[in-house]
C-alpha cells in the first residue's frame, strides 16, 4: 500500500513500529542474540527518548492500550524512555498513577508540574485511592470535582446542574462517587493538583455506619487535613 494512502493513525502506527523494532534489534545485537548485524556498523544510540503527542487523536482506545504495552516493553531496558502527552481519560486509565506527571497553568500562565501522591502502600487506603483514580481519570481534566457518596449522585446531580444552567460536560465537572471512604486522601490529592472540589455527604441512617457518624468521620478527617475548616463544637 502506498504510504500516501495510509490514514493518520496508520502512519503513526507505522512510524512507531519502525522505532520500536529498531530498538528491539539493537537490544538483540547488543545481547548477542542476533548475529545478522555488525554492531560497529549498526551504531545503536546510547539513549532513546520516544515522545508521543496526543495519540488518541488518530488511534482508537484499544490501539492506545497496545501502544502503551509496546512502550512498556521497550522502556524496561535502561536505554529508552517514553513520554506521552494526552488529554484522554482512556489513555490515563491504562497508566499507573505513579507514572503520571500532571501539568496545569497557574494564574500567572506558568506551567506547574505535579506528581500523583498516593497513600503509603502499607495503608489500606492505598489500593482504594489508586483504583478510584484509575476508575475516574476525568478528575485530571476537571475544573471542579464533586466527591459524592453513591451512584445516585451520578444520575441526579448532572440533571440538577443542567437545570440550573451549569451543564456538567461544558463546565468540565466530574462527579466521583466514592462512598465517603478515604476522603482525606482525595482532598490532599486534589489540593496538591489545585483542582477545586466539593464533598457531598448524606446521613444514610438506614445503612450500617450511617447517620451523624458520617458527618463526624468527615469532620475528623478534615481535622487532620485542614484543622481551620472543621465544624465548630457548638
Question: What is each model feature region?
Answer:
Residues 101-234:
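Acidic, divalent-metal-binding catalytic cores of TOPRIM
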